[in-house]
Amino acid sequence: MIGDGGELALVDVREELIFSQRHLLLARSIPLSRLELKFAQLVPRRLTRIVLCDDGDGIAGRAAAILARNGYSDLSILDGGIDAWAAAEYELFSGVNVPSKAFGEYIEHESGTPSIAAAELEQLLREKADIVVLDSRPFDEYSRVSIPTGVNVPGAELVLRAREIAPSPDTTIVVNCAGRTRSIIGAQSLINAGVPNKVVALRNGTMGWNLAGFACDSGKNRRAPDVSPNTLDWARTAARQVAQSCGVERIDHPTLEAWRKDEARTLYLFDVRDPAEYASGHVAGAVSAPGGQLVQATDHYVGTLGARIVLVDDAEVRAAMTGSWLRQMGWKDVFVLAEVGSEKGQPKTAMLDSETQSSGTVDCVELNALLSRNAATVVDLALSRDYLAGHIPGAWFAIRTRLKRALGKIPLSETLVLTSEDGALARLAAAEAEALVDSPVRVLAGGNAAWRAAGYALSTEARMADEAVDQWRKPYERSGDTKAAMNEYLAWEIDLLPRIARDGSLKFFSH
């Protein structure tokens, strides 16, 4: 099935951290615990061929039952799960976003993308050389930690904005990210577009900078200036040439509308501009997916292999460059739509129906009163990163699909109250909890978002009724020896290319 040319969604329903330890190369991580929330966005077409995989523990069967109830009809389960795949001597991969990470390594190898070591860059900055550092990550990552003097120019914005920041061809441009992939892709984007400057990637990004013993900035707000008409004209022409050379085609709105009605093919419509531009107005139905992130984490946005992908950008530059990379990654049907719409807000993706949902709720005032007299036990089903950042005082962390085990560790009071980010996941889990406890079960209306909005206190004192296996952690987010974790991660990235070649599922090419 893999590589036969037809559409296929290969979905791993284990928790993300477990998924990250070993998984099939082209599998998408959609944990059973959040299946109803995430599946329809990643796999929207009900007739898609779907293969579900697990550890052979039966959770893929539970996922299949939910999907079948919601109209997905072409469902299979990988017999024997991950262990059977390994026993058949097929490759398994660790980490997340593996195809995108491997692609970055491939591009550096095939294109000879030049790079600069942290020590050399530090010396140039100290000597005030004619150099600019462009950080190709989203602003939230940049603001947490950045290279001194670095300006935030997220990946797909580089070709559009770099010449505005470095108008002199004598200025050296250094592109960085946290590790390797976005630095390489960002630098090579500028080279492919033909900027007259010397362009290099910062080898190993901010992690390499830290490992070399240099301090990063934090909390900075250096952003690219607005683009002049001349810069836009140059960038549009350059990006079009790159896109055309990679086989990216442009379409018009009638073509898009015809494809929306095509029930035989999956369509993804992504607005690859800056999120602020998206928020000000976009084509109806488009999902915000800044181009750099779409290339960096394609599997987080696109659940169906072989689907059509339409990239929207009124300036065309971001879509053209993003499309060129997706084509080189092996996505055959990638198109650019140069439009801007008036739609506001994210498109509403239908949440899949659960078999049963409890209707019993409490509001924030009621919950606060229950807690004040020790009459409620709160179980928080939010993602562990969010829980650890701040939660309802006294709340226990648990994962929905492991609720039976978690509840066995929690001393229950008069009422069990479930909460989650916005309450949606808690509603899905309520009936499951009711079958496990004798206490009445209620859901916090509006979830943790409502609690925060009402001004109630949050706590960071963790009560873990389950392990935090729901999320993979970046090296610098992990406890323990951070430097060792960074070195391990960078070595993992570099080692991907030969392993991808052995697997044989991906066919990359370079511009």
Question: Where do the PLM segments sit?
Answer:
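Rhodanese-like catalytic fold shared by cysteine-dependent sulfurtransferases
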Residues: 1-9, 13-132, 136-268, 272-377, ...
